[in-house]
């Protein structure tokens, strides 16, 4: 039964999805990882085994396992990190500012107009995913990090300004700074809604 006075009750009426908390697609690691893997396979993308093996993830199962552990460590729903990574990298095909060897799965530091490779670079897959998780936590809450900070842009975020997936897009985020600019992860229209659309197809 939903508590109408509690946060989960509020979510059912506001139509937004909390970034923090336990997975919405499974109650254990094996189930959640399998659903992420299945979604990747359905995309018909070819996993960049050679490039990501160098960073410790030779296959999509290993990648999703690392992703799950890093998300759970900071109380972030793993499927949100997965969907965002797939959206940002085109199912790990890359092709934009960020290159596969940079182990940057969230477009960290890839500001509109930057040249190829002009963004954050990490030493391996786990560190890259950890940075993405930490950056998302910066937007989602004001809680301290559980792991040491590897996200060099963590302190650039105004904490807690996008607690919901749907608010990750600046155009949909109701919070604004003193200049009247909206907060959020990305400037693209419906950014957070596109993440949720992918998650909804995983159940």
List each language-model region with its residue ranges.
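Catalytic cores of secreted/periplasmic lytic hydrolases that degrade extracellular macromolecules
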Residues: 6-203
């Amino acid at each position: 039964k939903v508590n109408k006075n509690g946060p989960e009750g509020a979510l059912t009426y506001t139509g937004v999805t909390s970034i923090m908390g336990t997975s919405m697609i499974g109650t254990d690691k094996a189930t959640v990882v399998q659903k992420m893997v299945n979604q990747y396979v359905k995309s018909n993308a070819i996993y960049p085994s050679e490039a990501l093996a160098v960073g410790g993830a030779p296959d999509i199962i290993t990648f999703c396992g690392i992703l799950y552990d890093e998300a759970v460590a900071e109380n972030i729903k793993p499927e949100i990190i997965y969907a965002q990574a797939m959206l940002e990298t085109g199912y790990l095909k890359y092709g934009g500012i960020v290159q596969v060897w940079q182990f940057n799965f969230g477009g960290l530091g890839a500001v509109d107009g930057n040249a190829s490779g002009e963004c954050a670079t990490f030493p391996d897959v786990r560190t890259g995913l950890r940075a993405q998780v930490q950056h998302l936590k910066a937007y989602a809450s004001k809680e301290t990090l559980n792991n040491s900070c590897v996200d060099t842009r963590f302190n650039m975020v105004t904490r807690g300004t996008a607690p919901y997936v749907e608010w990750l897009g600046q155009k949909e985020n109701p919070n604004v700074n003193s200049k009247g600019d909206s907060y959020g992860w990305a400037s693209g229209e419906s950014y957070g809604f596109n993440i949720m659309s992918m998650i909804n197809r995983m159940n």
